[in-house]
Amino acid sequence: MVQLGQKDLLVDCQGNWGNILTGDGAAAPRYIEARLSKFALDVVFNPKTTEWKLSYDGRNKEPITLPVKFPLLLAQGVEGIAVGLSSKILPHNFNELCDASISYLRNEEFKLYPDFQTGGSIDVSKYNDGERGGAVKIRSKINKVDNKTLAITEIPYGRTTTSVIDSILKAVDKGKIKIRKVDDNTAANVEILVHLAPGIDCLIGRGARCQ
């Protein structure tokens, strides 16, 4: 339920539902509230697109099936393991899915690639149109604040600011990089400030990206 709410698509949330950027967990169930969004009521639970039956106590009606008018699986993303085979469907951009759906219905060619709430840049040269064996490479976005400070403003999908900072500190412990400290100012947007050690100059260009 929390994962659905964090997507801001099917569920309207109230309370502390956690933060996918920092990895902070949601509050206990008794402290959070949810309701179906207008999008969910129209696209998933629309009475004109499915058959309904009485609920177990006869007071309400519930859908027999849920045929969705929108490629929801591609928007949400999902992963799992069955019969020893791991499968992952990456999330996609809402607007791009709508455009791709229209092109598909018109029998027109289109390109559709994954998109992520956490931002970052993606290399789709080996994506293989999302079929078996395909792979993508996702990178953070790093900006130069000044000669002594770097700002990480986007992080790879599946990572959190906490895990990114941990990887930076491990690199420091191994002597791979030299920094003075790391500040996590993330709220609605990612902002990790990396302060370089004395004697270390920042040579990265503004808007550059690293893995």
What does each model-found stretch correspond to?
Residues 1-133, 193:
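Catalytic phosphate-handling regions of large nucleic-acid enzymes and associated NTPases
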Residues 78-81, 85-211:
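C-terminal interaction appendages of subunits in large macromolecular complexes
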